[in-house]
Amino acid sequence: VIKTSLSAGTLALAALAAAGSALPSASAQIRAPMVQANAESAPVGYASMNGGTTGGAGGATVTVGNAADFVRYATSASPYVIRVNGTITLSGMQDVASNKTIIGVGTSGRVTGGGLDLDSVRNVVIRNLTFTGAGDDAINVQDGSTNIWIDHNDLSNARDGLIDIKRGSDFVTVSWNRLHHQDKSMLLGHSDGNASQDTGKLRVTYVHNWLDGTTQRHPRVRFANPVHVFNNYYVNNSGYGAASTENAGVLVENNYFENVEEPTSIQEGSSDPGNIRAVGNHLVNSGTPVTRNPGAVKAVPYPYTAEAGGAVKATVTAGAGVGRI
């Protein structure tokens, strides 16, 4: 498993460097985030490419506990590391500007009522937050957003999707999240008619996620090639695991499927079929992964190490979700 050590002072140094030029309000103190030494300091996969994904590094670190302060810093043109200590209640989809790290404090950081909308932005990190009860999506990445890292969150009970990525967004890593109590989990590409914007984009890595009893879309892919789905733990997914449609190319590698009748799918709804290469997956009381044109799935363009499929359940259940970084 790829694991790198995070220097405890990395984000603190960034905050100190900018403290003289950006003075937070009294309700938002400058502090160093408390991050355990075993957390990854940078994303694995696509979000490590295209210049990398650092979020608000280089800006001030602020702590917020209410929606007003959260919105003020999340929409600022300046870089910020925003520590969420408490419940942020939103009334709808809340815009997040470029160059932001939004990270929960311990297990106390929560977003409810609404979700986060990353629209035409670059370089955003969302970590260690509990999302529940969104009136639409919990996290929506769209309109050409790039270099996004969604890591170590707990997501459930959204009205639509939990993590939807669409409209030409690119260079995204979704890692170490726990998804539960949800039908539609992770959409990648929103429409069969959006080939012109999506082809050659929507490159996403899904790694070390815990798909815990969710029904479908883990992910549901259109057009993108290659999408890399590896070292995830699927359990009790009554619809399907990963789906490839509209000539997408998806590598489904070294995942652990438990009680999943249909680990992979190449046909959903009215979409044309996609291509899947499935290798090294560990199956417990699960069906055989369906593949199609595995040679059409492009090579993954970044270095990585995949853990053996049989070890993934223990790794993911010990490390995914909030309070684990």
Sequence positions of predicted segments:
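Extracellular beta-rich repeat passengers
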Residues: 223-225, 230-234, 238-325
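Extracellular beta-strand-rich solenoid/capping regions of secreted or surface-exposed proteins
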Residues: 71-78, 86-103, 109-128, 132-145, ...
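Structural detector of coil-to-beta-strand junctions
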Residues: 115, 138-140, 162, 185-187, ...
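Right-handed parallel beta-helix
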Residues: 98-105, 122-133, 145-159, 169-190, ...
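Extracellular "leader-to-stem" segments immediately downstream of a signal peptide or signal-anchor
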Residues: 1-79, 287-325
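Residue-level detector of conserved, well-ordered beta-strand and adjacent loop positions
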Residues: 65, 103, 151, 164, ...
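Short aromatic-glycine motifs in intrinsically disordered, low-complexity regions
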Residues: 48-55, 89-94, 244
